[in-house]
UniProtKB/Swiss-Prot annotation:
Keywords: Glycoprotein, Hydrolase, Lysosome, Signal. Transmembrane segments: none annotated. InterPro entries: AB_hydrolase_fold. This is Lysosomal thioesterase PPT2 homolog. Expressed in adult head and crop. GO terms for cellular component: extracellular region; lysosome. The gene is Ppt2. The active site is at residues 98, 214, 269. It catalyses: hexadecanoyl-CoA + H2O = hexadecanoate + CoA + H(+); S-hexadecanoyl-N-acetylcysteamine + H2O = N-acetylcysteamine + hexadecanoate + H(+). Residues 1-22 form the signal peptide. Catalyzes the cleavage of thioester bonds from S-palmitoyl-CoA or S-palmitoyl-N-acetylcysteamine (unbranched structures) but does not have activity against palmitoylcysteine or palmitoylated proteins, branched structures or bulky head groups. Conversely, hydrolyzes both long and short chain fatty acyl-CoA substrate. Belongs to the palmitoyl-protein thioesterase family.
Amino acid sequence: MRLRLQVLVALLTCSSISVSLAYKPVVILHGILSGAESMASLVREIEEFHPGTIVYNCDKFNGWYSLENAWRQVDQVRDYLNEVGKLHPEGIIVLGYSQGGLLARAAIQSLPEHNVKTFISLSSPQAGQYGTSFLHLIFPDLAAKTAFELFYSRVGQHTSVGGYWNDPQRQDLYLKYSEFLPLINNEKKTSNSTSFKMGMVRLNKLVMIGGPNDDVITPWQSSHFGYFDENMDVIPFIRRPIFTSDSIGIRTLQEAGKLIIVVKPHVHHLAWHTRRDVIHEVIFPYLD
């Protein structure tokens, strides 16, 4: 009887260890005007309910430094993901929140040989941003309709926001001056266009999370690559060139069953990574 009990305990211990080892490491990138500490609730939930998970809570470009040029940030995030990936050849999961999701996506695209298995974009402006509520968090005296005068300039492009400010009624200026979003979305062809697409289609899973009550990402459908047209009507991503022309591989991922779109109502932008029920419903299913 004593031997059987010892064997049972050993089996349960081995089972627990194997489950822990099964969870892939998770890299988390914070949003704008915040830092790694803002993602602490999410880290605690992962560590409590997925014990043994290695979590890398990236602390680069905290606070006002998060307003630095987007490519400068992407370069460091790319190197960070590359180093973490080398430590875990079995593959990693990357979760980027808000601006962090956009920077993380660009970093992944810049690593065509990455080993990111799942990328979770948590309420991130993947198709750009155009809205007063977001703008006034950072530039209180700037109006959305005239923000292009700042952002579509050499000075404006030194800010991260300028890199993904997408004025639907100033598309000529957006394509002419913006040095970030049109490139990673392959709206402007460059020598990196092919590798940017390769970085995306290399993913096993792309999870896009957002919702209609976000109140910061504008339009909220940008979290799923949807966006305004020149008449300010929101066009869903499946009707936009980024999907129909498969410019960065989103259509390829969808056809392979690797694209997951999550729409969650009644969640404010600041709650996606802090509300326990939201974390468990929209994030945990994709942490394997």
